[in-house]
């Protein structure tokens, strides 16, 4: 079989990143970097069932019996529901359509499924790292290499950091590596290291002689983002309690043509003509292709490139037939 049909969400990663950056802007305006009041007045509290029994998150029991821990999480719940509610709703809608895939990929890589919502808070990293060129759902600073378990590229025509499947595998590899470096009971310190840097976290652990996220004073942005991630997860699991009503979102799907080898360069515009679709829609389904050079090249130098091309649901077979008729397909396809 030269192609396979894979159920994947068309999450339009560019749109997701715009939403994410909106959350960052709101946070910048609504969360002044000052010490919280010791006696906060909040509108939204933690659900009773969360407080009633030990709350385990990403392999770690959160010490909610401590008032300071409750405050840090409750403050972020109120921030999301009061200051960032519209963006929160959009993120939960996106999670409805693509969350299943992220959880599936993370589980396969041995990473807790709570990380499926971690991407929503990552734009907060950008504030303190303006010189770093982040990209994709997981805000990867650079593509993974072969020794990290997944080989990715960022070249003239593609950036694999924008591919949801490759990027998630890359993120999983890196978060597992960070966990082995910073230790800790669960995964919170690894997440903090992903946000704030492993060196800073290890230095803080040595300085404070602890591996507990809740016991070590960390940079405010790091503390807020991890608490926001937990808050977002609690809200998602208790939508009725927080009066969050989201119409059921059907998983958006696309098909993948795997192992495609071309006789000549194939442009996004040509694919759009074959399928009778706007070129913008085809590009959104293939987000790793760069908009300033929107092609699937037949060769890079003298090397034949093997492609995975994504189409809307029900269009995979049509595109294969059109490519055959137009003489785009090499006789020996990688999938055969």
Where are these regions (language model features)?
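Second-shell loop/turn segments in exported
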Residues: 78-92, 102-108, 126-135, 153-166, ...
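Substrate-binding/active-site groove segments that recognize
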Residues: 133-155, 168-171, 175, 203
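Catalytic and binding regions of secreted/periplasmic enzymes and modules that target cell-wall glycans
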Residues: 172-206
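Extracellular LysM carbohydrate-binding repeats and other cell-envelope/extracellular binding modules
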Residues: 136, 218, 281, 285-335
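Short, functionally critical alpha-helical segments immediately adjacent to catalytic or ligand/cofactor-binding
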Residues: 111-127, 190-196, 282-285
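Bacterial N-terminal signal peptides
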Residues: 11-22
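Primarily a LysM-type cell-wall glycan-binding module
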Residues: 247-276, 334-336
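An acidic, Gly/Ser/Thr/Pro-rich helix-cap/linker signature
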Residues: 25-110
């Amino acid at each position: 079989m030269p192609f396979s049909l894979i159920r994947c969400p068309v999450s339009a990663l560019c749109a997701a990143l715009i939403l994410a950056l909106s959350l960052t802007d709101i946070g910048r305006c609504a969360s002044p970097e000052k010490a919280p009041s010791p006696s906060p007045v909040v509108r939204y509290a933690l659900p009773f069932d969360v407080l009633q029994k030990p709350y385990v998150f990403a392999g770690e029991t959160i010490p909610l019996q401590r008032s300071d821990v409750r405050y840090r999480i409750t403050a972020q719940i109120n921030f999301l529901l009061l200051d960032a509610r519209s963006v929160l709703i959009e993120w939960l809608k996106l999670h409805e359509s693509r969350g299943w895939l992220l959880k599936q990929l993370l589980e396969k890589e041995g990473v807790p499924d709570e990380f499926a919502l971690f991407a929503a808070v990552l734009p907060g990293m950008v504030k303190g790292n303006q010189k770093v060129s982040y990209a994709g759902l997981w805000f990867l600073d650079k593509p993974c290499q072969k020794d990290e378990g997944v080989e990715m590229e960022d070249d003239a025509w593609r950036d694999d950091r924008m591919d949801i499947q490759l990027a998630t595998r890359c993120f999983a590899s890196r978060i597992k590596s960070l966990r082995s470096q910073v230790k800790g009971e669960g995964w919170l310190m690894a997440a903090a290291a992903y946000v704030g840097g492993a060196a800073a976290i290890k230095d803080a652990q040595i300085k404070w002689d602890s591996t507990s996220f809740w016991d070590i004073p960390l940079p405010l942005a790091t503390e807020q983002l991890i608490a926001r991630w937990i808050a977002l997860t609690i809200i998602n699991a208790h939508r009725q309690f927080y009066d969050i009503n989201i119409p059921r979102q059907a998983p958006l799907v696309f098909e993948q043509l795997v192992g495609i080898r071309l006789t000549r360069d194939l442009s996004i515009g040509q694919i759009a003509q074959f399928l009778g679709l706007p070129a913008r829609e085809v590009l959104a389904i293939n987000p790793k292709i760069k908009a300033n050079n929107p092609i699937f090249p037949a060769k890079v130098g003298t090397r034949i490139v093997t492609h995975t091309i994504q189409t809307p649901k029900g269009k995979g077979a049509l595109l294969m037939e059109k490519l055959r008729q137009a003489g785009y397909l090499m006789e020996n396809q990688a999938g055969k």
